[in-house]
Regions:
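Short, surface-exposed, charged amphipathic helix/loop patches that serve as local interaction elements
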Residues: 3-4, 9-13, 20-98
Length: 98
């Protein structure tokens, strides 16, 4: 028996985040998400946060983020939303019912 999975996969369907007029692409490849999980589980410090952003965004997008000069609160919000999207979660799911 041959089971075709091709039509059920989302090849190159990377989520994107828009901030003002900038669009950032989140790396949601399996390899990246597995590395991300390892980073989150073993870290939590500043180096872990930097490693997380390095995994989730391309160098070009990281430079764009840097130029935005975000506050730490906004930076952490961006990181959280990007992690949710990479994991296939709805970033707004935590805010339902408020």
């Amino acid at each position: 028996m041959l089971y075709s999975l091709t039509d059920k996969l989302k090849f190159n369907d990377s989520p994107q985040i828009q901030i003002k007029d900038k669009v950032l692409t989140v790396n949601n490849s399996a390899r990246t998400v597995l590395e991300l999980m390892d980073t989150v589980l073993t870290g939590g410090d500043l180096e872990g946060a930097k490693a997380t952003m390095n995994l989730l965004f391309s160098e070009k997008d990281r430079k764009t983020i840097e130029k935005m000069n975000l506050s730490i609160e906004d930076y952490m919000t961006l990181a959280g939303v990007a992690m949710d999207l990479a994991l296939g979660n709805d970033p707004d799911a935590d805010n339902r019912g408020e």
